[in-house]
Amino acid sequence: MKKYILPLVLVAALTGCESIYLPTLKEVPVYPTNRTQAEEGHSGSYHLASRHWTDVSKIRDEATRLSYEVSQGKLTKVQAAQYLNRYRIQLVGRNAVDDSVYEVYLRSAVDSQRGAISTEQSKLYIQNTLKGWQQRWPNMQSKPTNPAFTNFLMEVMGMEPLK
């Protein structure tokens, strides 16, 4: 339980600031970098990448570090969200699921930071997005092998991860 406290603090911290900052979303997922074996022409059932849960743990550790920076006033919540996104792209690459979830995560942080939504509304916004991916996941044709950012947030929110 203790390992979830700091990521939960990060989620809360990223959603409760009231300064105004509106970043532009410049990154567009054109070519996902971690595709499934089926996409690459291999047969067999779907499996997450062997390093997936290690990557989820690394993202959690980075989120914890960024949460501390936000609590010290060194970063805004939106800046922390952007740093976390750069970290996850560097760590696991891009994929449609993580890119989509990050877009909602950033929008939620921006809206919360400028006072348009509450921390609770921000959390619900992210949870609804995650629930949507849980519903789509079983029927997806091209599942990414390493949706680490999405599963990190699933873990933080106490939801069943994508498998």
Kindly give the residue locations of the regions a language model identified.
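Non-catalytic interaction surface on structured domains
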Residues: 4, 21-23, 111
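Intrinsically disordered, low-complexity segments enriched in glycine/proline and serine/threonine
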Residues: 5-9, 30, 82, 124
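Short, solvent-exposed mixed-charge patches
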Residues: 160-163
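Bacterial Sec signal peptide processing site at the extreme N-terminus
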Residues: 15-37
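Sec-dependent bacterial lipoprotein signal peptides
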Residues: 1-18
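Post-signal-peptide N-terminal segment of Sec-exported extracytoplasmic proteins
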Residues: 24, 36-77, 81
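Mature extracellular/secreted ectodomains of secretory-pathway proteins
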Residues: 60, 64-153
